[in-house]
Design a protein with these regions (language model features):
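Single, function-defining residue in the core of a domain
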Residues: 1-335
Length: 335
């Protein structure tokens, strides 16, 4: 469940650095974009102070496959999980990480339903699961620094006998959390699957809130706008996921009293809302309906763009409802 935004970073690339990849390799991480992952890890470590009994796992995509990130100091209770991007050197007879993992026996075969995507039909994919500990060696170009090796656990899922016309599913995860059993390996894969939530949030921010179309005049205004719309995008995402997880809960867990009352009166329409709030699923569908969602079939789910438009109208309705509604002492009783 997306509980909020822990940290956010904004930066602009220098056009003068284009085409200078070899030179960037010699720079310290503090002068590279890779430092963003260290900043994110710092934010997780800071959050640890607020919830000392909770294990926090910082999940990163392939861009986070950086030695400095994996070797960074972390307090107890803070862990890393990322997707490997490069076939790095490791200790052992196989010398490289992919060969080391693929030399391990398959411990389980998992069945994954792959939904339809564009012209590709939906299919059921069989994934082979492997895992093992690995010792990551420091980068070769930094041998003079005397950097230590890093002990990690690798978990790989690889599609078995994929169709010839599709890209096979394959991923190799690296984590600082020990993986000793098949159940723990599956759990690490499930952890990484949660990272898809940040992609959904970005899609809401870009396609729903259309942040890229906000032609703001300066970088400062752009950052302020991004801050505002980031919270709005989170609320849309949170409302959607909460409604799917607990659809029968009253919508008062998400909406204020005036908000759900304004929504109810606008949808039906009527001057007096009921005493009890509607369900969370119904309220989210009503908000999406304000944005043009039809939902002819019950299983249809509103998308980011309709929810964004719906929330805009919903906020206007709530504002007007607060202005125009009668005082509680003179409100008509429901018939």
């Amino acid at each position: 469940m997306p509980l909020g935004l822990l940290a956010q970073q904004v930066w602009a690339r220098d056009p003068n650095d284009v085409g200078k990849r070899a030179r960037r390799k010699q720079l310290p991480i503090s002068q590279k974009e890779s430092q963003q992952w260290l900043h994110s890890l710092d934010a997780v470590c800071t959050a640890r102070d607020c919830c000392p009994t909770t294990r926090l796992v910082s999940v990163g995509d392939r861009e986070a496959d950086v030695y400095d990130v994996l070797a960074a100091a972390r307090p107890a209770g803070v862990a890393l999980l990322l997707r490997a991007a490069w076939d790095r050197c490791v200790s052992g007879p196989e010398r490289y990480i992919w060969a080391t993992v693929e030399a391990q026996p398959v411990v389980e075969r998992l069945l994954l339903h792959v939904p339809r995507r564009g012209p590709q039909a939906a299919r059921d994919a069989t994934l082979a699961l492997r895992f093992c500990p690995v010792t990551r060696c420091p980068p070769r170009h930094r041998q003079r620094e005397g950097l230590p090796t890093v002990t990690l656990w690798a978990v790989q899922v690889q599609e078995v006998d994929p169709p010839t016309d599709v890209t096979p599913i394959e991923g190799l995860l690296l984590t600082t959390v020990a993986v000793d059993t098949m159940a723990e390996a599956i759990e690490r894969v499930e952890w990484y699957a949660c990272r898809w939530g940040i992609e959904v949030w970005h899609r809401i921010l870009k396609s729903g809130c259309r942040i890229e179309e906000r032609q703001l005049a300066s970088g400062e205004r752009l950052q302020r706008g991004l801050t505002l719309y980031s919270v709005i995008a989170w609320r849309i995402f949170y409302a959607t996921m909460l409604a799917r997880a607990v659809p029968e809960m009253p919508c008062s867990v998400l909406l204020e009293l005036d908000e759900w009352q304004a929504l109810y009166c606008a949808i039906h329409p009527c001057p007096t809302p009921p005493e009890e709030p509607p369900s969370l699923d119904q309220a989210v569908r009503w908000i999406a309906q304000l944005g043009g969602f039809v939902g002819r079939r019950r299983r249809d789910q509103p998308g980011a763009e309709t929810l964004w438009r719906g929330f805009q109208h919903f906020m206007d309705l709530t504002k007007m409802y607060r202005i125009m509604r009668p005082e509680p002492s003179i409100r008509p009783k429901p018939s």
